[in-house]
């Protein structure tokens, strides 16, 4: 089976999370760059990466890399790539997207047009055709230019991998599923600890946490462009990967995951989303304000995405809101708080400085992932709690 260079775009600042996921799948990392991780893998790896990696935006198959500072060099570089190894005679191929950063060639539309012409020229010569029907499987191409280095890829995923298939209803400021999963995996939260999101919105943090706890693969209930690439990936590999994912699931696990919001309609939407994700039985959703956040359990986790106040009229409410977050957190003995927000004065109104602070881009918005660490349970206490939990489950 052929080995490919597979490129996994991810959120800037969270490459280490994606890298760990790829390692856990058993693959060798070949390159780590800002916002993407590259690894070596075969056709089966394409299936497994799409279905299992939680933090990936998509999985790209690298066709080639070369330098280009003129459109002639771009044309010749793309024409020199072995497109016939990937695209059959009836394949539908087009340049889905082109991006350019700090490069002499900067017009995406021109890059797309020239790249398509170069691909056609190559395939005309190889297949001895003057016209392509393009009525077969789709082969979308994505091209990236960075400092005059061109990376040419085929998109195996299709829709972005944050589209798990469960979120039909969204709140006003939704967090993508891939970012939520990556942030959860960045924390030390484990499934034996309570997790609460007091600003749950459409339920993304609680749902992703429940899927992690139950080991439900994020791509089990969606389709991918490369499923149609019968010339590269046997259909059986997709069936086998889904079967592997089903075997690894533990949907009967006992966890304590809770999501609150002050909007009853939003809470209803979160419940519906959780039901579609198959984890509604693992999450308790409730209409509740952050000021009412309290819990008798110790060593819990608050992981949340509070309002940022991106609109001017909302900014006036932020000092009071973040003061309430700080007061609620102060009453949670031994708990940890993990919070993503773009609000620059978050620490000031929460009333303490974060133990860690990581800059992350949520789309085009620069945000901060504040990490307030609670105390850890002693090993003796942890062992005793697990014994009690096992007895309760019997």
Model-inferred region functions:
Residues 2-139, 391-394:
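Non-catalytic nucleic-acid substrate-recognition regions in nucleic-acid-modifying enzymes
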Residues 289-394:
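C-terminal catalytic and target-recognition region of SAM-dependent MTase-like enzymes
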Residues 100-103, 160, 307-311:
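A short, flexible beta-alpha/helix-coil linker loop
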Residues 48-55, 159-164, 168, 374-394:
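Flexible, glycine-/basic-rich loop-and-beta segments that form/coincide
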Residues 152-186:
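SAM-dependent Rossmann-like transferase core, predominantly class I methyltransferases
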Residues 175-295, 310-311, 317:
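Conserved S-adenosyl-L-methionine
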């Amino acid at each position: 089976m052929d080995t490919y260079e597979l490129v996994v775009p991810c959120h800037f600042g969270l490459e280490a999370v994606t890298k760990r996921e790829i390692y856990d799948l058993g693959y060798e990392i070949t390159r780590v760059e800002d916002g993407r991780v590259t690894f070596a893998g075969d056709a089966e790896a394409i299936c497994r990466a799409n279905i299992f990696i939680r933090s990936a935006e998509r999985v790209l198959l690298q066709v080639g890399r070369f330098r280009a500072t003129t459109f002639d060099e771009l044309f010749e570089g793309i024409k020199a790539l072995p497109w016939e190894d990937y695209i059959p005679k009836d394949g539908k191929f087009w340049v889905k997207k082109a991006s350019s950063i700090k490069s002499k060639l900067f017009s995406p539309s021109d890059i797309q047009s020239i790249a398509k012409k170069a691909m056609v020229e190559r395939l005309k010569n190889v297949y001895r055709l003057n016209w392509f029907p393009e009525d077969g499987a789709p082969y979308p191409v994505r091209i990236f230019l960075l400092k005059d280095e061109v990376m040419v890829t085929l998109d195996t995923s299709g829709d972005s991998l944050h589209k798990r298939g469960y979120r039909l209803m969204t709140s006003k400021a939704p967090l993508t599923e891939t970012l939520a999963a990556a942030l959860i995996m960045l924390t030390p939260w484990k499934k034996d600890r309570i997790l609460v999101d007091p600003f749950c919105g459409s339920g993304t943090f609680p749902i992703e946490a429940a899927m992690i706890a139950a080991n439900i693969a994020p791509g089990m209930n969606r389709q991918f462009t490369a499923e149609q690439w019968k010339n590269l990936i046997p259909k059986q590999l997709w069936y086998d990967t889904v079967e592997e994912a089903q075997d690894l699931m533990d949907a009967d696990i006992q966890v304590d995951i809770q999501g609150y919001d002050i909007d009853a309609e939003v809470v209803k939407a979160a419940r519906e989303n959780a039901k579609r994700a198959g984890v509604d039985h693992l999450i308790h959703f409730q209409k509740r304000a952050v000021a009412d956040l309290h819990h008798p359990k110790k060593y819990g986790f608050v992981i949340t995405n509070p309002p940022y106040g991106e609109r001017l009229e909302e900014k006036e409410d932020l000092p009071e809101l973040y003061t309430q977050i700080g007061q609620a957190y102060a009453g949670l003995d031994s708990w940890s708080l993990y919070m993503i927000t773009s609000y620059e004065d978050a620490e000031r109104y929460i009333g303490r400085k974060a133990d860690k602070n990581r800059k992350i881009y949520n789309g085009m918005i620069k945000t901060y992932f504040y990490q307030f660490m609670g105390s850890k349970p002693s090993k003796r206490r942890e062992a005793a709690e697990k014994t009690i939990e096992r007895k309760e489950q019997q």
